[in-house]
Amino acid sequence: MQVSRRDAMMLAGAAAAAAGAAPARALSAPGGIAPDDEAGWARIGALYPSMAGPVTQLEHGYWGNMANQVAETHKANVERLNRETSIYARRAMRKDQAVVKARAAQAMGVQPEEIGFCRNAAEGLQALISQFQGVAEGDAILWSDSDYDTSHAAMRSLAKSRRATPVMVNLPRAPTRENVIAAYAAAIKATPRLKFVLLTHGTHKSGMVVPVTEIAALAKAAGAMVLVDCAQSFRMRPFVIPDFGADFAVLNFHKWTGAPVGVAGFWIRPGAAPMVAPAAAEPDAKPEDVQAKVHQGTLDYAPQLTLPAALDFQEQVLPVPMKLARLQWLRNLWVQPLRGLSGLEIMLGDDPATFGAITSFRIAGHTSTADNIAITDTLFNQYRIMTVHRSGLADGACVRVTPGLFTKATDCDRLVAALKDLVPKIARG
């Protein structure tokens, strides 16, 4: 199904008009579809592949659906690459890649020469961490238990290779903006010679949205450079990269941007590129060459070439504030009825500044990785609900729930019913 810009705007406008005609809404989405307008979201959902099936899908944090027209653009790019191979790749593709880069930079709020592409955020994070040149023997680097697992490993490896002091902050068990800032502030104050700080904006474990702008300012005042992982927050929350006041950032385009799997980006503040060594395969790269920090080699170019189509569709049909309001509303549909259920720990509070789509839970006495894999297996096999376990938090493993844009209210109701049945049966202590 092809949707022109005019058709997309008409669709959004018609849905918004319908929302405005309704008597009351749980949340507001000015100029768009109200978060609880199921009919309006169904119309948008018709522009995507059908989600109908025997399993209730509540694990949308891995990657996002492409809209049908984006998938068609991706297919056309795959077919062109397959048909024209090196004639296109060596003679014409570079011009198209420059257009893609400019469009990506525009969405990020930065300049094209400040960004590079990678296949996923983990790849970009590995490069920026392991190749960071601003840490010497006796210096310190800092991260938290909520950061991505492979980033933990990269930070430890950086500390070991440079004989630096590794400092990991355990975030509060019931996180709020205030106590998370306080935890980082205390760690920063207590850490002499701090040179490098990793912050995750939207955590993939609990779902906490960390106030990175405030924390980055504290870290920079202490003399550290700051890397922000916004893989789970880009285009789910309204921001541009410079808002963070950081030196580096990494994000995914295949989560909440709706691009094909296999396209992500990273940003380096102007003037900071020499602080990251080029990839080993790029020994002759200029220090200011951002893309040279990740050597791409030959890869599937179709996802990158499709990125402008995904960004255009999102901006025309799914503005970020409208998207966020929907995801938070869906999250609240399952969280609110389960607050206070004996044996169940909802890991985030209800301040909208601290969550997006993701919120995780624990069942009392089940804190090991094996425990939480078993819970996700039970939810899948017995209740036909898809979730995922997450491990690595200081207080133990958990189960992550991530509604998608076209999750239905009834899907959240099924999870509520399942946990009300399951938790009393297996909670310990």
State each model region's role:
Residues T176-A231, R235:
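Active-site phosphate-binding strand-loop segment of PLP-dependent enzymes
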Residues M1-A15:
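N-terminal secretory signal peptides and thylakoid transit peptides that target proteins
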Residues A89, Q291-Q336:
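Structural signature of PLP-dependent enzymes
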Residues A325-Q382:
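Conserved PLP-binding catalytic core of the aspartate aminotransferase-like
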Residues S368-T369, D377, N381-T387, S391-G429:
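PLP-dependent enzyme catalytic core of the Aspartate aminotransferase-like
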Residues E84-E123, L327:
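Conserved N-terminal alpha-helix of the aminotransferase class I/II PLP-enzyme fold
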Residues F244-K286:
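Active-site PLP attachment segment
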Residues E113-E114, F132-H152, D371:
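Conserved PLP-anchoring active-site segment centered on the Schiff-base-forming lysine
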